Curated annotation (Swiss-Prot):
UniProt superkingdom: Bacteria
Protein name (record): Transcription antitermination protein NusB
Keywords: RNA-binding, Transcription, Transcription antitermination, Transcription regulation
Pfam families: NusB
Family: Belongs to the NusB family.
HAMAP family named in the record: NusB (MF_00073)
Organism of origin: Streptococcus pneumoniae (strain JJA)
Length: 140
């Protein structure tokens, strides 16, 4: 039986982030998603949730476009390459969810902040909050 926690969107976003990080080091979307979703489960033959696959494959497909959108909101002199891999992937995930899903914008921002707190530090969480909040404000 599937744990309710693994089926929550928050947990699926965490899996999506982990899969995106794996993709930075060379694997395919299916393998990265499967590992992130099943790494602590006994039954690894489960069907992957569509939300997880859609997030990861969408970010991968639009990575260049997302990076351009993120770069437009960085301070002068900053490049996307200057950001950590964690920050880059959290921002990509946040911007993609804001622009491509029916998730309320503030929910997408908050989820990215919470992931930053889990996988980085408070300074990174504040940076992600600022950039995504600016992005949302300018998109409206």
């Amino acid at each position: 039986m599937t744990s309710p926690l693994l089926e929550s969107r928050r947990q699926l976003r965490k899996c999506a982030f982990q899969a995106l990080m794996s993709l930075e080091f060379g694997t395919d979307v299916e393998t990265a998603c499967r590992f992130a979703y099943t790494h602590d489960r006994e039954d690894t033959a489960v069907q992957l949730p569509a939300f997880l696959i859609d997030l990861v494959s969408g970010v991968q497909a639009k990575k260049e476009e997302l990076d351009k959108q993120i770069t437009q909101h960085l301070k002068a002199g900053w490049t996307i390459e200057r950001l950590t891999l964690v920050e880059r992937n959290l921002l990509r995930l946040g911007v993609f969810e804001i622009t491509s899903f029916d998730t309320p914008q503030l929910v997408a921002v908050n989820e990215a902040i919470e992931l930053a707190k889990d996988f980085s530090d408070q300074k990174s969480a504040r940076f992600i909050n600022g950039l995504l909040s600016q992005f949302v404000t300018e998109e409206q």
